[in-house]
Amino acid sequence: MAPLFNLMLAILSIFVGSCFSESPTKVQLVGGAHRCEGRVEVEHNGQWGTVCDDGWDRRDVAVVCRELNCGAVIQTPRGASYQPPASEQRVLIQGVDCNGTEDTLAQCELNYDVFDCSHEEDAGAQCENPDSDLLFIPEDVRLVDGPGHCQGRVEVLHQSQWSTVCKAGWNLQVSKVVCRQLGCGRALLTYGSCNKNTQGKGPIWMGKMSCSGQEANLRSCLLSRLENNCTHGEDTWMECEDPFELKLVGGDTPCSGRLEVLHKGSWGSVCDDNWGEKEDQVVCKQLGCGKSLHPSPKTRKIYGPGAGRIWLDDVNCSGKEQSLEFCRHRLWGYHDCTHKEDVEVICTDFDV
């Protein structure tokens, strides 16, 4: 009996091997908006069928996108997200396990033992469409030829090349996103034009962005082709506030001295009009220097007057702010002071 059983097992293994030894020869996406989106179908032994979404994840979709010469993964649809396949189509693959670096789905670990999967569990894939006008996504952004990294001519990195941006596709909401992405303050001059000295050279990025102004970076905005024959005379120039930085100078430690704040790439002083203990507290807190000492700021002038710009005046804090940038003050650069009125702050040197 044992020899007969072994013979039957051998015949069965040959039959199974003849049916499933070959990996899928072709992959396609069906039912989506373009060739790089849809239900995943594979060809196996001349028959097209679907893939079960058991364990289907972003790594598997990445391989499908790569095999089809599509762009990056956008989504990993599961559960029959697209139109149902033809009634005669079978579910050919129960499970797919890719590490995400394979060039084709055939190089992944595939399970052909379909036992509990229906077309309601068909796997899908959504990749960037390289044939679409919408594939203008900037990889990075920078502001150049300005006084600091928060002011200048807008340039975006696209397909490994820096390009200027036409102001026809620019607005306040886009500027807000750029300022946030660069780690700068709020948007000031939002979409001015470059002058002859600050115009760029080389390619002009012909994309138009639609942002709400709340996005973390430009990649989260909607993009389309800009139908405009722009020249470098229309290069976009914008300015953000600098990151709110402050320091105490002239003292024996970083926790005592004349107060200076950074604006437009330059350090300047703060006028002591209306300055008091609450404002001292906020500065010490922001610098990690503990609590403020000497509650009569008007009486201490021991670190000498500053030079250059006086950036802030009439600063008013509640004392609860974590940074001086959240306190009320006059517009940057507006004041009625001299450097004899520069603010000085002395803190305890450590958090308590």
From Swiss-Prot:
At the top level, the lineage of the source is: Eukaryota
Q: Which cysteines are joined by disulfide bonds?
A: C36-C70, C52-C117, C65-C127, C98-C108, C166-C230, C179-C240, C211-C221, C255-C289, C271-C337, C284-C347, C317-C327
Start and end residues of each SRCR domain: 27-128, 141-241, 246-348
Q: Post-translation: what modifications? A: N-glycosylated. N-glycan at Asn-99 possesses only alpha2,6-sialylated terminals, while Asn-229 possesses both alpha2,6-sialylated and non-sialylated terminals. N-glycosylation increases secretion.
Q: In which tissues is it expressed?
A: Specifically expressed in tissue macrophages. Expressed in thymus, liver, spleen and lymph nodes. Present in Th17 cells; mainly present in non-pathogenic Th17 cells.
Give the signal sequence positions.
Answer: 1-21
Query: At which residues is glycosylation annotated?
Result: N99, N229
Description of the deletion phenotype? Mice are apparently healthy under specific pathogen-free conditions. However, thymus of mice display much fewer thymocytes and CD4/CD8 double-positive (DP) thymocytes are more susceptible to apoptosis. Increased adipocyte size and adipose tissue mass. Higher level of free cholesterol in Th17 cells.
Q: Which keywords label this protein?
A: Apoptosis, Cytoplasm, Disulfide bond, Glycoprotein, Immunity, Inflammatory response, Repeat, Secreted, Signal
Q: What induces it?
A: Transcription is activated by nuclear receptor liver X /retinoid X (RXR/LXR).
| Localization per Swiss-Prot or TrEMBL | Secreted; Cytoplasm
Enumerate the Gene Ontology biological process terms.
apoptotic process; immune system process; inflammatory response; positive regulation of complement-dependent cytotoxicity; regulation of complement activation
Which residues are annotated as site, described as Not glycosylated? N316
One Pfam match, given by its short name, reads SRCR
Question: What task does this protein carry out?
Answer: Secreted protein that acts as a key regulator of lipid synthesis: mainly expressed by macrophages in lymphoid and inflamed tissues and regulates mechanisms in inflammatory responses, such as infection or atherosclerosis. Able to inhibit lipid droplet size in adipocytes. Following incorporation into mature adipocytes via CD36-mediated endocytosis, associates with cytosolic FASN, inhibiting fatty acid synthase activity and leading to lipolysis, the degradation of triacylglycerols into glycerol and free fatty acids (FFA).
For this entry, the protein name equals CD5 antigen-like
This protein's species is Mus musculus (Mouse)
Primary gene name: Cd5l
